[in-house]
Amino acid sequence: VSALFTPLHRAARTGPFTRLLRLGACLPGTADSIELRKTEETTLTTSTHRTFLTGRRKALAVLASLAAGTAVLPGAAFAQAAYPAKPISIVVPFSAGGTTDILARLVGQYLSTELGQPVVIENKAGAGGNIGGQYAAKAAADGYTLFMGTVGTQSINASLYKKMPFDPIKDFAPLTRVANVPNLLVANPQQPFKTVPEMIAYAKANPGKINFGSPGNGASPHLSGELFNAMAKVELTHIPYKGSAPAVTDLLGNQIAIMFDNLPSVIPHVRSGKLRAIAITTAKRSPELPDVPTIAEAGVPGYEAMS
């Protein structure tokens, strides 16, 4: 899951966020309900290389409400300025080229058109998204810095790292959910297996020899691989990267054997024949690749994972 957040500081829990509460976007860490009201989700369609933002207008309405609220922040000069009066940044906690980056750039294009200001994408990769999260959390809560968070940065990392550099609940206010994305198990075509059963047999005959890349420790593709290890009773070796793009580059060069990655990041390479699609991690097949089986139906019953 990818979602759009804005930094939230204790001193700024009134003002720009008052209107957000009225629209149902919650302020975590306050006495208000911490449950986000349902928003329309993005439908990501890669076959035409376009994203149909079905929830775009609702997301923009939330951002517009944020803009309206900025007028009551302390400071007469700031109160008189129309929002947005300068470019807006979207911090992406992974390198350019991955799904989180793709989504941020698509959202940024729409925001720039609707709000009349440039939207700049800042890629701050590393530590499973924690570097970008810390960077965004320290930004001013003035509506000019947004954060494209993921299930990893806002949930999983808190269980994996002894000390988080930011509080994923108290330091951010959620604006809208952006997308749910399936993961795809892909292999370099030079690998000797083409199906899940063949890969399992090869992995059991060669423990630790199959290495799999991921966008970083704790990212959902990493956990997809570890879940496969546990359920298939094999030993795949994890190699973390600072984002999806460098991992895919090494996969294309056969420096790593396989990868569990978000569908949008790898499907162009599957369609060009540069990567081999083995299985999809969700419970149902993807309409984008209807001939590619799920991992569950291909030999690991009960397996299901997504980003």
Q: Where are the regions a protein language model picked out?
A:
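N-terminal secretory signal peptides
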Residues: 3-12, 16-54, 61-72
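Sec/Tat signal peptide C-region and signal peptidase I cleavage site
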Residues: 73-79
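N-terminal (or domain-start) structured segment
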Residues: 79-170, 209-211, 217, 233-262, ...
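Hinge/capping helix and adjacent helix->loop/strand transition within the periplasmic-binding protein
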Residues: 138-143, 151, 159-246, 295-307
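Short secondary-structure boundary segments
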Residues: 150-151, 189, 263-264, 282-283
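C-terminal lobe and pocket-closing loops
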Residues: 194, 266-307
